[in-house]
């Protein structure tokens, strides 16, 4: 059962309810089949997504909805869009815009029930996506370090663009940024 997803250019996030033993085989099959499809369609070869998959057991509902928020906000954090509903390769559109009517949806109806029990409306769940959350959702130390560096770089890139800074050396001399 798929609870949330977001497909980026070099990786994807997928929240699934699965038997742990079947998860590895499922992910191997998914990556392999998608690589064949993508490579045939675009005349490419090799892996489509970088690295192996990482999984984490979600035991608390509060952590689950925070992970969904993290997944949906991935393209916003990458500055691809300013709103989660503007990104076409995410379950956010299926959940919030009811795109299920237009095409066969892949989100489990179970997650919609869980969300309706936790939030009074989809608007409230949408607003929850805009609540700041600095949780990294990463369990592997090397990935946490890489994530921290990416967050710093992302912040600096945003700061440079926002303040129209042409020379990156200027930013390094700003005391409140260092």
Q: What name fits each language-model region?
A:
Residues 1-4, 8-9, 18-178:
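Short Pro-Cys-Gly-centered "Cys-loop" motif that presents a nucleophilic cysteine in a tight turn
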Residues 15:
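Conserved active-site beta-strand element of glycosyltransferases/polysaccharide synthases
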